[in-house]
Amino acid sequence: MSRQGISLRFPLLLLLLSPSPVLPADPGAPAPVNPCCYYPCQHQGICVRFGLDRYQCDCTRTGYYGPNCTIPEIWTWLRTTLRPSPSFVHFLLTHGRWLWDFVNATFIRDKLMRLVLTVRSNLIPSPPTYNVAHDYISWESFSNVSYYTRILPSVPRDCPTPMGTKGKKQLPDAEFLSRRFLLRRKFIPDPQGTNLMFAFFAQHFTHQFFKTSGKMGPGFTKALGHGVDLGHIYGDNLERQYQLRLFKDGKLKYQMLNGEVYPPSVEEAPVLMHYPRGIPPQSQMAVGQEVFGLLPGLMVYATIWLREHNRVCDLLKAEHPTWGDEQLFQTARLILIGETIKIVIEEYVQQLSGYFLQLKFDPELLFGAQFQYRNRIAMEFNQLYHWHPLMPDSFRVGPQDYSYEQFLFNTSMLVDYGVEALVDAFSRQPAGRIGGGRNIDHHILHVAVDVIKESRELRLQPFNEYRKRFGMKPYTSFQELTGEKEMAAELEELYGDIDALEFYPGLLLEKCHPNSIFGESMIEMGAPFSLKGLLGNPICSPEYWKASTFGGDVGFNLVKTATLKKLVCLNTKTCPYVSFHVPDPHREDRPGVERPPTEL
């Protein structure tokens, strides 16, 4: 039979196969056990329960068939056979700099970037599927944006153990778990050279779409934009936005202190900000995100973006003197969204990845691909992004070290030092390694405790189920996970089975890639969420990605040429050392601040 004949008949043979049978649960299980507690359906097959002890796997469009979606179709088999492992791909991308220097200078870079974007983004379901209240496809899951979506349905409530059927009947105490495995003994710097400028950017950037609703519960969000909408700059609702706006020339309100532009006080912009009692209103700065008064590092970025917005408005006003306040404001917002995405992909994600492949923000790479320009934030992404090991033991500004007690809610540091000095200090101080465990400062360990408790309330499936969902092999032992024996033995004692390990502890305790900030799972799970959210923004669509959207070539070029250095140095009187990477110790250290060039 010819090869063409096989390719034509193979799909027909699949059609003749009977649908997946309704199967009984494991015969050795005590009845009645929900059969879906065993997670029998593989390769993204959907488990549907029938009666008390029967189930059926829906293998539609998974590329697999059979009772548990385990038999590959021929093209699936070829694809999986030829696909390199994630660890091998990571090795290739982080070795052979001379080869990647050549690739980055050729058309191959665009080809690889398109492949990265499509392969990663295809792992995220669109439209969204489940949420905290619905473990099945429903109109509510699709239409109600008050929910976080979720990638995997929750652990069924009637399972024998909290994680399904594996492990112990009671999970280890969250506080004990955090103190034993996550609490810092000694600060472990990130071997990739990540700094506090990166750490504060991560917090500032993600708090526009990670805004869990305290009233509704951990499955709900107040960030209804579900992506890069800059709600942390402009507010997450129209009322807050109006309080922050100047309503003149498209600009935001501001105050002048020591001859510099800073966010207005809550007296001038009466919005809710979370400050401790006793801090007078005139000392509370008003910005889009109500929690940014917590850290001077967050308020540094809030100040920089405020200055950038008003600077862009001046440029647009010069180009379009007939435009009114509203059009100037809205166009400036789109430009800042574009600048944010450009900086995130080409500098922030680049620093995280450690890749020699130079990442590129070019929405046109996806114009020929099937891609949906909308996004929904997943609760797993929210859980994953608690990167508190980045925070140091103390914060060094100039010659002085500030403790957490001195740094948190410090309302005078920003104005006393100025943006340039703080940017320079944060760019020079190393951040901590995220993966590998035992690197969260005791002042913020309670956050990890709360994350673990929240994941139990949300009934997230085990860590290994998420590894399978994102195309990785499940770990077979705790020692394989951690890469060492002592911690592995303790985890075995607490959980009883590697298949019962929880999602967040698994991410933070996984052994890191060599000279990397974290391990395989954080990269393979985090990258799809990030890239889908960034490129799924409407400004990246063919309808929006054109000069007219951004007020002409001047605005479009602001987006296309944005960098972290430009963002800072075009909004300060002097140009500090600014980077997501600590200075190279082999180079002669430059002065703390420089005068910015006229062209950056």
From Swiss-Prot:
Q: Which family does it belong to?
A: Belongs to the prostaglandin G/H synthase family.
**Which residues carry the site feature described as Aspirin-acetylated serine?**
530
Subunit structure comment from the entry: Homodimer.
Among Pfam families, the record links this protein to: An_peroxidase
EC? Answer: 1.14.99.1
Q: In which pathway does it act?
A: Lipid metabolism; prostaglandin biosynthesis
A single GO molecular-function term is:
metal ion binding
Q: Where in the cell is it found?
A: Microsome membrane; Endoplasmic reticulum membrane
Q: Which species is this record about?
A: Bos taurus
Protein's recorded name = Prostaglandin G/H synthase 1
What this chain does, per the entry, is described as: Dual cyclooxygenase and peroxidase that plays an important role in the biosynthesis pathway of prostanoids, a class of C20 oxylipins mainly derived from arachidonate ((5Z,8Z,11Z,14Z)-eicosatetraenoate, AA, C20:4(n-6)), with a particular role in the inflammatory response. The cyclooxygenase activity oxygenates AA to the hydroperoxy endoperoxide prostaglandin G2 (PGG2), and the peroxidase activity reduces PGG2 to the hydroxy endoperoxide prostaglandin H2 (PGH2), the precursor of all 2-series prostaglandins and thromboxanes.
Residue ranges of domain EGF-like in the record: 32-70
Fetch the PROSITE patterns from UniProt: EGF_3, PEROXIDASE_3
